[in-house]
């Protein structure tokens, strides 16, 4: 049943990431190549923030020459692997988040996206 699912059951394990010192232009290119709307920002295995395609668009063309650290969101909502899916869904709906990092001991272990959540619900019928 869906109410029994936890973050660990639906999270994306192979997460595309960037670093604070990468250029925004490189992060944008990686998002396009990987077909993702945002990248967690990792420094020495620790989650530092997230940068999204929307962040880059809102900042304008001059943002492409900045470092990811200058543009990333640092105040993140994160969950752990045991967070119930119903809690994650509530957060995503109420806050309008499209992705939520899954962390253990400050380290990124996965990512919950709207797509991964929908896929999990759709798979419940199988």
Predicted features, each with a name:
Residues 3-15, 66-76:
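Bateman (tandem CBS) regulatory domains
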Residues 5, 22, 51, 66, ...:
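Short beta-to-alpha loop/turn elements within the nucleotide-binding domains of ABC transporters
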Residues 12, 44, 53, 65, ...:
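ATP/adenylate-binding site constellation spanning eukaryotic-like Ser/Thr protein kinases
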Residues 14, 35, 75, 96, ...:
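Conserved functional loop/turn residues at catalytic and ligand-binding sites
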Residues 17-35, 42, 79-96, 102-104, ...:
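The conserved cystathionine-beta-synthase
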Residues 56-69, 118-126:
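A short, polar/charged loop-to-alpha-helix boundary motif
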């Amino acid at each position: 049943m869906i109410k029994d699912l936890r973050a660990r059951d639906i999270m994306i394990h192979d997460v595309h990431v960037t670093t604070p010192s990468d250029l925004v232009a490189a992060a944008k290119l990686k998002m396009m190549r990987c077909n993702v709307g945002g990248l967690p920002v990792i420094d020495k295995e620790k989650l530092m923030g997230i940068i999204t395609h929307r962040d880059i668009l809102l900042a304008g063309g001059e943002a492409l020459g900045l470092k990811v650290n200058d543009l990333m969101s640092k105040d993140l909502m994160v969950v752990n692997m045991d967070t119930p899916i119903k809690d994650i869904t509530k957060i995503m709906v109420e806050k309008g988040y499209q992705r939520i990092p899954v962390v253990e001991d400050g380290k990124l272990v996965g990512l919950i996206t709207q797509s991964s959540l929908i896929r999990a619900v759709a798979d419940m019928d199988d």
